[in-house]
Amino acid sequence: MLGSLFRKVFGSRNDRILKTMKKDVERINLLEPEFEALSDAELKEKTAEFRKRLNDGERIEKILPEAFATVREASRRVFGMRHFDVQLIGGMVLNDNRIAEMKTGEGKTLTATLPAYLNALPGKGVHIITVNDYLAKRDAEFNQPLFDFLGLTVAFNIPGMAPEDKKAAYQADITYGTNNEFGFDYLRDNMAFAPQDRVQRELNYALVDEVDSILIDEARTPLIISGPAEDSSEMYRKMNELVPHLVRQEKEDTEEEQGDGDFTIDEKAKQLHLTEHGQEHIEELLKEKGMLDADDSLYSAANISLLHHINAALRAHHLFQKDVDYIIKDDKVVIVDEHTGRTMEGRRWSEGLHQAVEAKEGVPIQNENQTLASITFQNYFRLYNKLAGMTGTADTEAFEFQSIYGLETIVLPTNKPMVRDDRADLIYLTTLEKYEAIAEDIEECRKQKRPVLVGTVSIENSELLSQLLKKKKIPHAVLNAKFHEHEADIIAQAGRPGTVTIATNMAGRGTDIVLGGSWMAEVEKLEEPSNDKIEKIKQDWQKLHDAVIEAGGLHIIGTERHESRRIDNQLRGRAGRQGDPGSSRFYLSLEDPLMRIFASDRIGTMMKRLGMKEGEAIEHPWVTRAIENAQRKVEGRNFDVRKQLLEYDDVANDQRSVVYDQRNELLDEGDISETIVAIRDDVINSVISEYVPPQSLAELWDLKGLEERLRGDFHIELPLQQWLDEEDHFHEEVLRERVLEELVKAYQEKEEMVGPEVLRRFEKSIMLQSLDQHWKEHLAAMDHLRQGIHLRGYAQKNPKQEYKKEAFELFTEMLEALKLDVVTILSKVKVRAQEDVDAVDEQRKAADSAPREFRHEQSGPAAEEPQKNTDNAQGQPVRKGAKVGRNEPCPCGSGKKYKHCHGKL
């Protein structure tokens, strides 16, 4: 109350910032007559003038008013579109490392041209990030004439481009693309074999469209590049056969958990847990199938993979539904994005879940993958020098933007007053009653010739409603993941009088619904366009547009509340654009997931007490408040999930930064011999210390063991025991110096044989190959550590602190293993000529040409648009005979694991 009173007297911080920016808008408006008087050539010259002033040390903020005036005038000449004052304010907000909340239809695409132009002037590049490839290409092509006029280069970055095309795209002043593609390019650059293979340059300025969708909805799980691991398809099939024998325990109270159920389900957390009875039952079933020894336990260390597979199978059957979480298309399980309702071709869930769903549906099971590189969006976007974003709905997540990204949210006023009528929610007892009421509302709107957009949260719901409308003979179009090929056509005409469109989650669709339909879409259909035909289409459209406005504009119907208020607001925001009339209403039932999980019992009891009958609905502030509280709970939980992910990933991020910086230095260096010398000294001293404890008596030395180690790992024969017996002053320091001298001498002989240039290249190849291999294994170790670390809480230990401590120990061990690896390989391998170096490079390239997946895992966890790696695609050699596993004994007979012996190269 006091805060509200304070804001009334002094205004909010948002108001004060807007007030300051309005003064800059006035300055830009005063420049307008001067810039209107410039010729095209003079206006184009402004870009070179601004660049010179920046090179001379002038600050970018000083140039802002003139730069914005230049873009506004150029836009007027090129597009016939003049930036509104509100769009100028939006441009300033975006230049100041902030988030601009701009309502639907306020012209975000045009607003973005202002900060993009200004921040492209220093020549370091601007990345404009969109939610899908279609929008990236559309916006780049739409704005290209404007930037061409101003002398700036524009490109788009989409999956499947050749490396040289990608490199050219990143060299452009302004590059459009998706968040996933920019992130994957960063990871790919840090897996490159040569400096020229990298495509990105310095990450300068990122402008994120639909920033809430990208930095919040998609930030729960990381971007992952993975490669094929071992085949375990048969295991998934066997586990799938066990699931029908397992029974869910209905009661989840701990007191009643000793019942006969095998597992419990936590719908809120989308988790599943085995009961004690379930563990025993599964062990019996596994023993019957011969998958578990008679005296063995499911929880013994050797059987962890069995537990992993049974858990994945249970989750596939009980937590993931066909036509809600995924669809079957061309004999493949295709994930449906819970945020946008789109199918995500090739995207895969991790942790074996996708394979378990494939086994459940009886489609071919794809192999599991191993992580090669990974980063979260939080840590990727924090690499940019400047970051800004825009969306229609950011205010509900303002705290998260501020706390995680350091981005302040500024809510911009609309250019014209908002007149949309947002009606109160209607709550019914059952889903059937709710859908009947929705159908009646649609029929009423059709009588009034009003267009209707119905938003559903899943494909299943959209098809259910579609069947109901078909029975009632109400014509309609369905826009969901199954038919998104026709999406643009459907949306283009969704504003025509009496049109009914059913759409799964509209978030991130990126296309405005224009009242009366899109006359431009009609023009594009003309085989032979002429001015007369275009004018006729425009006149017909104007009549339809006026008729829809007269009828009350677009009506939005929500079939249930989403777990995030922001997604509900995005659906509502489809109506009432640019001051148009419109209305919205949500229809709910006690059977909706959000109501069932969070609010059902209390509200259900209250509704029955009020004497509600079948088909009746209630509108009451208490109920609305209960729903909003439920949404806040979910939003709070999701924020905690993302925050926790970031806290854990920050540990990995520090390690990632060290490894990637070191790797890039290696790539850029022509000669790494100094690094090799330093590593060799460290390794030899460590090895000697294992057999000759520092400052110890000679009686405690294990010289025989050291001789064998030097012979086996470094290929040098030294009579250490003989030296000790024959020399009076053979102290520890003398021993260390002598061993190092002999190792250096042997290495110098190798260098004289092949020449320094060949050896320098070989050193670099081995160093990069070993670093990549150890980093890959380290990522797997970090994954395993992360998955089990929460159990430390039962031992009264802080899991995060334990994770930090053990992650550091793992990282230290990895670096030591890497150094030993490099020195032993360089000591043992005989390099005869340049061909041997080329052979190592070819092996690295062959490993790289193996099929890869590029995944962005969603909360499931699910993964993004895996594109198969098409770069350097080569035929794979055919291996005759059994493949040697990395952990199996080496066939050479050394007694070591294959990965530590001949598997190194």
Curated annotation (Swiss-Prot):
Pfam families documented for this protein: P-loop_SecA (PF21090), SEC-C (PF02810), SecA_DEAD (PF07517), SecA_PP_bind (PF01043), SecA_SW (PF07516)
GO cellular component: cell envelope Sec protein transport complex; cytosol; plasma membrane
Xref: PROSITE patterns: SECA, SECA_MOTOR_DEAD
Membrane topology classification: Peripheral membrane protein
Enzyme Commission designation: 7.4.2.8
Basic residues bias (residue ranges): 896-905
SMART domains registered for this protein in UniProt: SecA_DEAD, SecA_PP_bind
InterPro entries, sorted: Helicase_ATP-bd, Helicase_C-like, P-loop_NTPase, SEC_C_motif, SecA, SecA_CS, SecA_DEAD, SecA_motor_DEAD
Region (Disordered): 836-905
GO terms for MF: ATP binding; metal ion binding; protein-exporting ATPase activity
Cofactor annotation remark: May bind 1 zinc ion per subunit.
Cofactor dependency: Zn(2+)
Record's catalysed reaction(s): ATP + H2O + cellular proteinSide 1 = ADP + phosphate + cellular proteinSide 2
Residues binding ATP: 87, 105-109, 512
Superkingdom of the organism of origin: Bacteria
Subunit structure: Monomer and homodimer. Part of the essential Sec protein translocation apparatus which comprises SecA, SecYEG and auxiliary proteins SecDF-YajC and YidC.
Function according to Swiss-Prot or TrEMBL: Part of the Sec protein translocase complex. Interacts with the SecYEG preprotein conducting channel. Has a central role in coupling the hydrolysis of ATP to the transfer of proteins into and across the cell membrane, serving both as a receptor for the preprotein-SecB complex and as an ATP-driven molecular motor driving the stepwise translocation of polypeptide chains across the membrane.
Family: Belongs to the SecA family.
Record's protein name: Protein translocase subunit SecA
Organism: Idiomarina loihiensis (strain ATCC BAA-735 / DSM 15497 / L2-TR)
Designated gene of the protein: secA
